[in-house]
Design a protein with these regions (language model features):
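ATP-dependent carboxylate/phosphate-activation module, predominantly the ATP-grasp catalytic core
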Residues: 201-204, 210-276, 280, 298-320
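Conserved ATP-binding module of the ATP-grasp superfamily
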Residues: 131-133, 153, 157-160, 173-212, ...
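ATP-binding N-terminal substructure of ATP-dependent carboxylate-amine bond-forming enzymes
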Residues: 1-111, 120, 127, 141, ...
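Short beta-strand-to-turn element immediately C-terminal to the catalytic PLP-Schiff-base lysine
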Residues: 138, 171-176, 223-225
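A conserved helix-loop-beta module that forms one wall/lid of the active-site cleft
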Residues: 101-170
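Active-site "cap" helix and flanking loop/linker of ATP-utilizing ligase/carboxylase catalytic domains
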Residues: 7-9, 262-283, 289, 299-356
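Glycine-rich phosphate-binding loop signature in dinucleotide/nucleotide-binding domains
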Residues: 75-81, 152-154, 193
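Peripheral (often C-terminal) accessory segments that flank ATP-dependent C-N-forming ligase machineries
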Residues: 322-423
Length: 423
C-alpha cells in the first residue's frame, strides 16, 4: 500500500507496533474494507528497521525512535488520523497521550496508566468496591537488609511481580519472609523497570466443575464503545507451569451458567472501576472459594485470543476492535456462540532447563485432526530462562476441537508424545 495521501477514501487508523505485538497480517486482513493503516514503530530496536520495511508494504509507517508523544503528534497531524489502537501493553500510554492531543476517542492517559500499572490498578479496583488482595510496594533499594525488613511487613503466602509487565515475567510465589528475600535476590537488575516491583496476597484457587484438569482462572475479552460493555468471549486455562507460566488456553471456557454469570459481573465491575469507556480489554479472573476475583485487567486483546475465537466461532475480534477504534458504536450480544473449541497450547520447559538440545515429534503432532499451526519459539541451541515467564515457551500449537474431550487428547499428546531434551 502506498503512503496515505490527503485524498484518501477510507478512514485512517494509527496502530502501535513492536516486539510481541499482534500479528500484523491479521490486523491488515481485519482492516480490509474498513480503513487504511498507519503503523507506529521504533526502528532503533532489534529488528525494528526490518519490520518497518515489511509494514511499508501494507500501510504507512512512522518511525517514532526517540520521539516523545508530542513529537509524534506533530508528525501525525499531517495525516489527520481517525483513530488509534494498541495491541501490546507498551503502546497503551504512549497512544493515550497522542489521542488526547489529536482529540481522538481512546483511553485517557489516567485510565491508560491504570491499565498497565498493576499497583495503580489494584488501588482503583479497591476504590471501586471490588475485593482485592493486599499489596506492598517493594523498596527501590533492594539491598538484603532493606528487603529483610520489608519482608516482615508482608502477609503470606504472596506473589512477587512487576508493577508493569506481562506474561508472568519475573513473577514468583513467596511462602514466607525468607522466601521473599531469596526471590528478590534472584531478580536481575532490570526487573521491574522504572516503576519497580510489588507483592500481593496470593488468592487460593477453586477448581471448575470439570475438575482439576483445567486451570483455576479464566479471562474475559471485552469490547467497550461509548461506555457500553460487551463481553465477547471467556477463555479457559490449563494449569500453570511453575511458577506462573501459561501452558494452554481455550474458548469457550468450561464454566457452569452460575460461574459464567458471576465472572462476567466481576469483569463489568472491574472495567467500570478503572474508568474504561472505549477500546478492548482482557480481564483475568481467578475462581476462588470466596467467588471470582480479578487478577489483572489489560487494556488490549489477550495474546492468541483473536485466533482462538476465529477458529471456534468465525468472528474476527480484530475486526470488531478496529471498528470501535474508528468510532463505531459496536455492541455485541456475547459471549459469542462457538461451534467448537478453539485452543492454543504453549509448551513450557522445566525451571531447571537452561538450553534446548532437541525437539522430536512435532511432525506427528501436526498430523493430528484439528491442529492448524505449530510455531517453534525456542529451537535447539537456544537459551531459556524461566524468569522470563510465559514468553520463553518452546513451541505453540493452534487448533480447534469438537469438544473438551478432543481438547484433552491434544493436551495428552503434546505432553506424552513430543520429546524435548534440555541442558
Amino acid at each position: 500500500m502506498p503512503p496515505v495521501t490527503a485524498d484518501r477514501r477510507q478512514p485512517l487508523l494509527v496502530v502501535g507496533h513492536g516486539h510481541r505485538s499482534a500479528p500484523p497480517m491479521q490486523i491488515v486482513e481485519a482492516a480490509s474494507g474498513l480503513c487504511d493503516l498507519l503503523w507506529l514503530i521504533d526502528e532503533s530496536v532489534p529488528d525494528g528497521a526490518f519490520t518497518s520495511r515489511l509494514l511499508r508494504k501494507v500501510g504507512t509507517v512512522l518511525n517514532i525512535a526517540g520521539m516523545t508523544p508530542r513529537e509524534a503528534v506533530s508528525s501525525l497531524q499531517a495525516y489527520s488520523p481517525d483513530g488509534v489502537v494498541a495491541y501490546r501493553d507498551e503502546d497503551i500510554v504512549f497512544l493515550s497521550l497522542i489521542a488526547a492531543e489529536l482529540g481522538l476517542e481512546y483511553r485517557t492517559p489516567e485510565v491508560a496508566r491504570r491499565l498497565v500499572d498493576k499497583l495503580l490498578q489494584r488501588e482503583a479496583l479497591s476504590n471501586g468496591g471490588l475485593s482485592s488482595p493486599f499489596c506492598w510496594e517493594v523498596p527501590a533499594d533492594r539491598s538484603p537488609a532493606v528487603i529483610e525488613s520489608f519482608a516482615e511487613l508482608v502477609e503470606y503466602p504472596a506473589v512477587l511481580k512487576p508493577r508493569i509487565g506481562n506474561g508472568g515475567q519475573y513473577t514468583m510465589p513467596v511462602a514466607d519472609a525468607a522466601d521473599l528475600v531469596r526471590s528478590v535476590a534472584l531478580l536481575p537488575t532490570e526487573a521491574g523497570g522504572e516503576t519497580g516491583m510489588f507483592v500481593e496476597q496470593y488468592l487460593p484457587s477453586l477448581a471448575t466443575e470439570r475438575g482439576e484438569r483445567f486451570g483455576g482462572y479464566v479471562s474475559v475479552e471485552s469490547l467497550v464503545a461509548g461506555g457500553e460493555i460487551s463481553h465477547v468471549a471467556v477463555t479457559g486455562r490449563f494449569p500453570l507451569a511453575e511458577p506462573f507460566r501459561e501452558t494452554g488456553f481455550f474458548i469457550p471456557a468450561d464454566l457452569s451458567e452460575a460461574q459464567l454469570a458471576a465472572v462476567l459481573e466481576v469483569a463489568t465491575d472491574a472495567l467500570r472501576a478503572l474508568g474504561v469507556r472505549t477500546g478492548d480489554c482482557h480481564t483475568e479472573i481467578k475462581l476462588t472459594p470466596d467467588g471470582p476475583r480479578v487478577l489483572e485487567v489489560n487494556g488490549r486483546l489477550g495474546g492468541g485470543v483473536p485466533e482462538m475465537l476465529l477458529q471456534a466461532s468465525g468472528v474476527s475480534l480484530f475486526g470488531l476492535s478496529i471498528r470501535i477504534a474508528l468510532g463505531e458504536p459496536v455492541v455485541v450480544d456475547g459471549p459469542i456462540p462457538c461451534g467448537g473449541v478453539g485452543w492454543r497450547f504453549l509448551f513450557q520447559p522445566p525451571t531447571s532447563a537452561r538450553r534446548v538440545v532437541s525437539i522430536e515429534g512435532l511432525d506427528r503432532l501436526a498430523a493430528l485432526p484439528g491442529v492448524n499451526e505449530i510455531y517453534v519459539n525456542r529451537s535447539p541451541g537456544d537459551p531459556i530462562d524461566w524468569r522470563e515467564g510465559t514468553r520463553h515457551y518452546i513451541y505453540s500449537v493452534y487448533g480447534v476441537s469438537a469438544d473438551y474431550d478432543e481438547l484433552m487428547e491434544i493436551n495428552r499428546f503434546l505432553h506424552e508424545e513430543v520429546s524435548i531434551a534440555y541442558e
